[in-house]
């Protein structure tokens, strides 16, 4: 987990590779005695500037790509723009507090990344809260388990030659539900139609939000993974938005536990360009895809995963309202 926040986007491996492919030939041509060498230098500098320049936390090429994707989505079907690698399945359970108190056992839940010989692609906790002024004030919390076929192929083949990935995910979710019931939580496996959608089918995407059919604006945000993460999550839950969705996702990169977080805020008016809270990064031009990825059954891993130590995990908390208790 990073101790600092930065608005400068971090270039990925592909972007760095492209920059090096343009810059290295220019450097090797030094001192650029010929016209051709000077063209190589100019092209290298131009490519580096285009690929590394940014505005409001986004690379310029990312801004262009998202603008073009928005134009395409307005003239065709709306789909999740996130890439999926291979077959995967997700199962979710709804959880409410009872005798156990109001704070989820995050260490226990994260432990289901590797349990019963299966490796989960991600384990996520999602909470939805609505303001008391709404028609259905209250809160809901779900825990989702996502499994990919590739890393679990031997275990799946041992269970059945048909590779029952969805059934395996549901069995793992039931085992987690049983585990939570043993320590006093009320849980139940849920289907997709039992979880409300973040936006309606006819919602219209703009650069700063998605305009829902009711006229409300729903904006998605990445949550910075830094030393202030616990405080940021608390401020999201305490915000005065009409509706909030908050997600905390755990994964395992093979050497350590990682975490990512995101949220969505529904407001009556369009959000401005800046984030409403410190620690939030607006998903400018990518709100629809980000909102689809926030759904408890989406199966899409959140962006921005960073390493999380056991001590940092212990410092996080996730309160859950008891059944029938309003969120705020």
Regions found by a protein language model. Give the residues of each.
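N-terminal alpha-helical membrane-insertion module
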Residues: 1-76
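Alpha-helix initiation/capping motif
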Residues: 10-17, 59, 105, 116, ...
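Extended aliphatic helical segments
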Residues: 19, 23-27, 40-50, 60, ...
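N-terminal topogenic membrane-targeting module
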Residues: 42-134
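Residues at beta-strand starts and edge strands
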Residues: 87-91, 119-121, 139-141, 217, ...
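An amphipathic, basic-hydrophobic helix/alpha-beta surface used to engage anionic
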Residues: 99-184
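Membrane-proximal, solvent-exposed terminal domains/tails of membrane-associated proteins
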Residues: 146-149, 153-328
């Amino acid at each position: 987990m990073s101790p600092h926040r930065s608005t400068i986007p971090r270039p990925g491996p592909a972007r760095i590779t492209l920059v090096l492919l343009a810059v290295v030939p220019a450097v090797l041509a030094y001192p650029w005695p010929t016209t051709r060498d000077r063209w190589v230098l100019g092209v290298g500098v131009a490519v580096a500037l285009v690929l590394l320049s940014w505005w409001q936390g986004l690379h310029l090429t990312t801004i262009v790509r998202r603008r073009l994707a928005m134009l395409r989505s307005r003239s065709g079907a709306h789909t999740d723009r996130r890439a999926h690698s291979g077959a995967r399945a997700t199962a979710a359970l709804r959880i409410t507090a009872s005798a156990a108190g109001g704070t989820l056992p995050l260490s226990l839940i994260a432990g289901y990344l590797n349990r019963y010989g299966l490796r989960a692609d991600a384990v996520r906790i999602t909470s939805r809260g609505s303001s008391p002024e709404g028609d259905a004030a209250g809160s809901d919390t779900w825990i989702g388990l996502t499994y990919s076929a590739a890393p679990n192929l031997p275990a799946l083949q041992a269970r059945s030659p048909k590779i029952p990935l969805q059934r395996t995910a549901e069995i793992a979710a039931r085992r987690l539900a049983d585990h939570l019931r043993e320590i006093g939580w009320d849980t139940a496996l849920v289907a997709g139609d039992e979880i409300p959608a973040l936006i309606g089918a006819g919602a219209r995407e703009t650069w700063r939000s998605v305009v829902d059919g009711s006229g409300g604006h729903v904006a998605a945000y990445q949550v910075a993974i830094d030393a202030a993460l616990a405080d940021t999550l608390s401020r999201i839950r305490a915000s005065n938005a009409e509706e909030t969705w908050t997600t905390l996702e755990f994964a395992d990169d093979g050497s350590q536990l990682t975490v990512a977080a995101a949220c969505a805020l529904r407001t009556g008016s369009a959000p401005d360009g800046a984030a409403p809270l410190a620690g939030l990064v607006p998903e400018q031009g990518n709100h629809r895809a980000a909102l689809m990825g926030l759904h408890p059954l989406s199966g899409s891993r959140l962006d921005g995963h960073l390493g999380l130590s056991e001590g940092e995990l212990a410092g996080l908390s996730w309160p859950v309202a008891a059944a029938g208790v309003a969120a705020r």
